[in-house]
From Swiss-Prot:
Source species of the chain: Solibacter usitatus (strain Ellin6076)
NCBIfam families in the record: GTPase_YsxC, small_GTP
Pfam families: MMR_HSR1
Family: Belongs to the TRAFAC class TrmE-Era-EngA-EngB-Septin-like GTPase superfamily. EngB GTPase family.
Matches recorded under HAMAP family: GTPase_EngB
Protein name listed in UniProt: Probable GTP-binding protein EngB
Keyword rRNA-binding assigned: no
Binding site for Mg(2+): 37, 59
């Protein structure tokens, strides 16, 4: 896939600093270090657009990336593991909840799971919240390249047990990029 025109716009720690241009937004949600930033980089064709790290909890604000001047990809802080004081973790939680509940320009979310780990309680809580509020989302199963074929199938089968069809993704091979874009563009065209 060729690179899209994509640019970092703002890193927001408060709702009043979110972009105000009313472009539609696609949110990337998941545990810390699950591959949200790597997925954004793969989707845009820019290896260093979104900062990636092997250290969980590096994304500590909501990061907005404008794509082709038409919409935003939004990288949210990961939930779960992060070496930060409890007060910061609570601030992230409040910020994320506010974004998901009140952001009118949020049109679609990618709920990202590590295929090796499957569903954790906080993932299930988020899935239930999205279902309850009628928010459209796609479950993306990352890190498939770290598993052999039978391990991949076992991980994907475990994810399917919650009644969703995960879309496998690999940052190394690009597996799943086209299908994820198809889901995003279908949603954007419908709204």
């Amino acid at each position: 896939m060729s690179s899209l025109k994509a640019e970092f716009v703002v890193s927001s720690g408060k709702p009043d600093t979110f972009p105000s241009d009313r472009l539609p937004e696609i949110a990337f949600l998941g545990r810390s270090n699950v591959g949200k930033s790597s997925l954004i980089n793969a989707l845009t064709g820019h290896k260093k657009l979104a900062f990636t790290s092997n250290t969980p909890g590096r994304t500590q604000t909501i990061n907005f990336y404008r794509v082709d001047e038409k919409f935003y990809l939004v990288d949210l802080p990961g939930y779960g593991y992060a070496r930060v004081p409890a007060g910061f973790a609570e601030q992230w939680k409040v910020l994320i909840e506010h974004y998901l509940e009140f952001r009118e320009t949020l049109k679609f979310s990618c709920l990202i799971l590590d295929t090796r780990r499957g569903w954790m309680e906080k993932d299930l809580d988020l899935k239930r919240w999205l279902d309850h509020h009628g928010r459209p989302y796609l479950v993306v199963a990352t890190k498939t390249d770290k598993l052999n074929q039978s391990e991949q199938e076992r991980g994907l089968r475990a994810i399917r047990q919650e009644g969703v069809e995960p879309l496998p993704f690999s940052a190394l091979s690009g597996r799943g990029v086209r299908e994820i874009w198809q889901a995003i563009t279908t949603t954007l065209q419908a709204r």
